């Protein structure tokens, strides 16, 4: 029992999830404009796109470094938290290639992983946290987990202590 305060934060993933519609080709001006308007709207967490080892162009919300993301962030003082996604198994950027957190670019990494990638995801999460970033753990396809597998995953996440752990699907 007892009354526990519930805290909610809004996360906008337009530039990452929306990319499945337009192949992440938002255009540089649109990317900077969307980020600026989301900042003005005081959105809690703004996802800028994917961190990927793929070849990318400046017109896409696909980035191969946090420095590339820094270039599109609002230039004024920012109150929103900026993050990017690394999707294990999807032309991902290995976290060893991340530069240490310096406060100029993104603050966090959303890490997605499948059931067969849990141990790898935990290993990667440790690397990301050691570099100073907040890590958000997002298992993919949890509908295919048994109850016991979900409980075991929760236990592993409790040991890891990520900034956030959430179930989407």
Residue ranges and their predicted role:
Residues 7-13, 35-52:
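N-terminal glycine-rich anion-binding loops that anchor highly charged ligand groups
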Residues 45, 50-156:
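Active-site beta->alpha loop and helix N-cap motifs at the rims of alpha/beta catalytic domains
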Residues 1-17, 22-24:
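N-terminal amphipathic alpha-helix/helix-capping segment at the start of soluble metabolic enzymes
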Residues 9, 83, 136, 164-166:
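A structural signal for isolated positions on well-ordered beta-strands in alpha/beta enzyme cores
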Residues 25-33, 113-120:
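Glycine-rich anion/phosphate-binding loops
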Residues 3, 31-40, 154-158:
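Short amphipathic alpha-helices and their capping/turn segments at secondary-structure boundaries
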Residues 150-169:
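Conserved C-terminal portion of the radical SAM core fold
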Residues 18, 38, 109, 165:
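Conserved, mostly hydrophobic/aromatic
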């Amino acid at each position: 029992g007892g009354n526990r305060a519930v805290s909610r934060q809004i996360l906008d993933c337009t530039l990452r999830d929306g990319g499945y519609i337009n192949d992440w080709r938002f255009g540089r001006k649109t990317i900077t404009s969307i980020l600026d308007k989301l900042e003005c709207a005081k959105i809690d967490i703004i996802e800028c796109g994917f961190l990927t080892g793929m070849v990318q162009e400046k017109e896409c919300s696909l980035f191969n470094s946090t420095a590339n993301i820094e270039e599109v962030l609002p230039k004024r003082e920012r109150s929103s938290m900026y993050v990017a996604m690394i999707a294990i198994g999807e032309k991902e950027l290995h976290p060893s290639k991340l530069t240490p957190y310096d406060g100029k670019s993104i603050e966090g990494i959303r890490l997605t992983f499948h059931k067969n990638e849990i141990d790898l995801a935990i290993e990667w999460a440790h690397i990301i946290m050691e570099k100073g970033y907040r890590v958000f753990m997002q298992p993919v396809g949890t509908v295919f987990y048994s109850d016991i597998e979900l409980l075991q995953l929760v236990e592993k996440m409790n040991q890891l202590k990520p900034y956030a752990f959430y179930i989407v699907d």
